[in-house]
């Protein structure tokens, strides 16, 4: 077994963390934002580095980054963690009690409060045991002195007013057996009764934080035993005035089987202390108390999914909301999700560049203080120039997260997006600013995105000066996709895949590709399609999903940019109320989309148009009765008037092709119906209701049944962020129940 131990104040040194800040630029930037100054500059500033309000945040950050580096390089997770004073916050961070930012906020406040303490002093008495030091204090009526630290069996730190410490130091220097009395360079009486005011203010501050269940036992400085979840806040707050019982903490860990220790952070102060303790003291063999409720609360909404994924995307939850065409996944939806620690993708399909740019600027303004979001880009096989323009726009505005949908292969535009800004970090790792989450459902497509970019594309982009030679070189060492989203049967474009088959296959493919190309960073695999209930989300995580992506359920929320009439229809649907219909944007190929069918004629009429397209070479070949039905029932206008609208919509080049090819002309006329059916639905035109094209999967039907009889039964009470949090919380609860039941039967 192994314990990771984290040092506290006194271990700081000038230049610490220099090899870490470049390796973790996003966390370093977060630290700078929280602290209001550069953490890297602080660690170079010897004067500030020795001031409590700066020392503690600096050590916390360096310890935390050291831990991440250690786990990433070795894959090693400790069996226990402990930290000396300030270092205990890193032990709790490693155990998952809070994330990096929350821990830094706590440490910043702690350092500020402790730095206010004036007139105090501390001294280390070396050569006497805790009992002997206590006897000397009592015999000499030094009752204003507290024991602050028990660092080793014979290194005891005392704390109190400066004049009392001076008096006590003189007494101890005359005591037989004392090897040295070392006065510490501090201004406060830390870990003593004199920190009560700081403790009380910190107690009020910590109240607003929600600590997650510990995934690794953490040894408390105060009790020298593992933290109990229900007493976490009280124990951590009590550390400010309580003694740091480091000796018994290590003795307790020594009592576990074959325990080894590794110090994580700057210096080797704790390593030296542990060597003294193991040489001078016996192990404590108390049994570890496991709280009865621990099994019931081991999994939380925030602990679901891959931790590195959440850290990379700066998320609290491993929960994404996929892009929906024509901006149905609206800017309002994206902002709502970001504010709650989730991520949504603005849907650009069917929108012009100006509309998308306005949305990006609006979202960036709303999230100027933080929050992650992305842009969904749908592949357009016929108009790759529009894809290039979209990538230009995303790069122009510094968009980092792209959800790639309906791509059957890797395109130059995607490669260019991924390549821009690539650089090699100080530790040799490749730092990718732009991230692509490839949404796919076929292994051959996954293989393309899990491979480095094709060399011919890189050479062409470099020759055209669209990427640099260095960017092209680095692209040969990383996959095109930062992460993969495996899309099972879903609303909209779908291959009708089955998650139980797809997820294991793609995960194994990912593992094979990781070995083949020896990538330095794992590609995470997420799950989408059919996720609308806790049971479905649980199944996704149990299949190995690092994150989940919802879609259909978000279309029936207040934030969805579609009509109330559509939401009324969606609210009433059940799992059987969908059908497959031809996709308007891929009409000629026969690709399918899944749509709502209950009370609508669109699925039938769309299929009829595609059947006619397949059977006839031109619209003139269609018999008069059928053509009249199309004009009166489908188009509610003559074919000639529809073609006039088509000519106004498409480019001269497209119309020229249509004039030369009657079948192409027929396709453009029929595709007008698909565009109009979507536009009418979004607008909420009651006269065109039966022709509404509403992309949707069975997940929403399952969701409707789940929330039936609750306040969420009405879409007017459904908000994308609230749905996301509720789904994750209920999934965590369900997992705990199922695991508990499973363990009881074993």
UniProtKB/Swiss-Prot annotation:
Gene: baeE
Active site feature: 85, 191
Keywords: Acyltransferase, Antibiotic biosynthesis, Cytoplasm, Transferase
Domain of life (superkingdom): Bacteria
Keyword Transferase on entry: yes
GO cellular component: cytosol
Pathway: Antibiotic biosynthesis; bacillaene biosynthesis
EC category name: transferase
Family per similarity comment: In the N-terminal section; belongs to the FabD family.
Reaction(s) catalysed (UniProt annotation): holo-[ACP] + malonyl-CoA = malonyl-[ACP] + CoA
Keyword Transferase applies: yes
InterPro entries, A to Z: Ac_transferase_dom_sf (IPR001227), Acyl_transferase_dom (IPR014043), Acyl_Trfase/lysoPLipase (IPR016035), Aldolase_TIM (IPR013785), FabD-like_helical_ins (IPR049489), Mal-CoA-ACP_Trans/PKS_FabD (IPR050858), Malonyl_CoA-ACP_transAc_FabD (IPR004410), Malonyl_transacylase_ACP-bd (IPR016036)
A family per Pfam: FabD_helical_ins
Entry's Gene Ontology molecular function annotations: [acyl-carrier-protein] S-malonyltransferase activity
Region (Acyl transferase): 1-312
Annotated source species: Bacillus velezensis (strain DSM 23117 / BGSC 10A6 / LMG 26770 / FZB42)
Protein name: Polyketide biosynthesis protein BaeE
Function text: Probably involved in some intermediate steps for the synthesis of the antibiotic polyketide bacillaene which is involved in secondary metabolism. Probably has an acyl transferase activity and could also have a flavin mononucleotide-dependent oxidoreductase activity.
């Amino acid at each position: 077994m192994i314990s990771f131990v984290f040092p506290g104040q006194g271990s700081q040194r000038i230049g610490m963390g220099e090899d870490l800040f470049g390796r973790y630029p996003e966390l370093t930037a977060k630290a700078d934002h929280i602290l209001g100054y550069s953490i890297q500059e602080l660690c170079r500033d010897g004067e500030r580095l020795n001031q409590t309000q700066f020392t503690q945040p600096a050590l916390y950050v360096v310890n935390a980054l050291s831990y991440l580096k250690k786990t990433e390089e070795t894959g090693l997770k400790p069996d226990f963690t402990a930290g000396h004073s300030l270092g205990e916050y890193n032990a709790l961070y490693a155990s998952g009690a809070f994330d990096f930012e929350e821990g830094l906020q706590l440490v910043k406040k702690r350092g500020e409060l402790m730095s206010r303490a004036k007139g105090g002093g501390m001294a280390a008495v070396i050569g006497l045991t805790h009992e002997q030091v206590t006897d000397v204090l009592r015999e000499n009526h030094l009752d204003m002195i507290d024991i602050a630290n028990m660092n080793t069996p014979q290194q005891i730190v005392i704390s109190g007013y400066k004049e009392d410490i001076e008096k006590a130091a003189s007494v101890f220097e005359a005591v037989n057996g004392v090897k040295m009395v070392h006065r510490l360079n501090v201004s406060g009486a830390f870990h003593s009764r004199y920190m009560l005011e700081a403790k009380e203010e910190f107690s009020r501050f910590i109240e607003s934080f929600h600590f997650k269940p510990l995934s690794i036992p953490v040894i408390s400085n105060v009790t020298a035993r593992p933290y109990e979840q229900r007493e976490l806040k009280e124990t951590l707050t009590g550390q400010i005035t309580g003694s740091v019982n480091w000796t018994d903490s290590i003795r307790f860990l020594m009592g576990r089987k074959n325990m080894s220790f590794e110090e994580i952070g700057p210096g080797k102060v704790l390593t030296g202390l542990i060597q003294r303790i193991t040489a001078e003291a016996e192990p404590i063999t108390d049994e570890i108390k496991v709280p009865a409720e621990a099994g019931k609360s081991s999994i939380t909404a925030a602990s679901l999914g891959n931790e590195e994924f959440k850290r990379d995307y700066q998320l609290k939850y491993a929960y994404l909301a996929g892009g929906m065409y024509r901006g149905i996944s609206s800017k309002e939806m994206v902002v709502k999700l970001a504010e709650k620690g989730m991520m949504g993708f603005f849907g650009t399909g069917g929108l012009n560049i100006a509309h998308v740019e306005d949305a990006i600027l609006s979202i960036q303004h709303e999230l100027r203080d933080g929050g992650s979001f992305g842009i969904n880009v749908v592949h357009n096989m016929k108009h790759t120039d529009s894809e290039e323009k979209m990538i230009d726009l995303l790069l122009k505005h510094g968009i980092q997260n792209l959800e790639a949908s309906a791509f059957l292969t890797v395109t130059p535009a995607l490669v260019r997006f991924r390549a821009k800004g690539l650089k090699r970090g100080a530790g040799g790792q490749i730092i990718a600013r732009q991230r692509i989450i490839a949404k796919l459902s076929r292994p051959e497509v996954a293989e393309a995105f899990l491979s480095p970019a094709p060399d011919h594309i890189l050479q062409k982009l470099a020759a055209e000066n669209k990427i640099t030679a260095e960017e092209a070189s680095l692209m040969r060492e990383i996959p095109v996709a930062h992460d993969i989203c495996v899309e099972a049967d879903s609303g909209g474009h779908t291959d009708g895949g089955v998650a139980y088959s797809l997820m294991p296959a793609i995960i194994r493919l990912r593992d094979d590709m990781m070995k083949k190309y020896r990538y330095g960073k794992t590609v995470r695999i997420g799950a989408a399609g059919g996720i609308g209930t806790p049971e479905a989300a649980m199944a996704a995580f149990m299949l190995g999903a690092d994150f989940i992506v919802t879609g259909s359920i978000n279309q029936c929320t207040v934030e969805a940019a579609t009509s109330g009439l559509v939401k009324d229809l969606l609210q009433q649907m059940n799992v059987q109320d969908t059908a497959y219909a031809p996709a308007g944007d891929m009409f000629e190929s026969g690709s399918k989309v899944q749509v709502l069918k209950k009370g609508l004629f669109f699925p039938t009429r769309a299929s009829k148009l595609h059947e006619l397209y397949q059977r006839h070479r031109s619209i003139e070949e269609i018999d008069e009765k059928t053509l009249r039905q199309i004009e009166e029932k489908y188009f509610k206008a003559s074919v000639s008037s529809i073609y006039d609208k088509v000519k106004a919509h498409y480019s001269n080049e497209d119309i020229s092709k249509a004039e030369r090819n009657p079948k192409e002309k027929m396709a453009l006329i029929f595709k007008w119906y698909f565009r109009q059916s979507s536009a009418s639905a979004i607008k909420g035109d009651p006269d065109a209701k039966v022709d509404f094209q509403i992309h949707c999967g069975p997940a929403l039907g399952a969701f409707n049944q789940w929330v039936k009889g609750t306040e969420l039964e009405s879409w007017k009470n459904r908000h994308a962020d609230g749905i996301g949090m509720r789904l994750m919380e209920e999934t965590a609860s369900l997992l705990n129940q199922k695991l508990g039941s499973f363990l009881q039967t074993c």
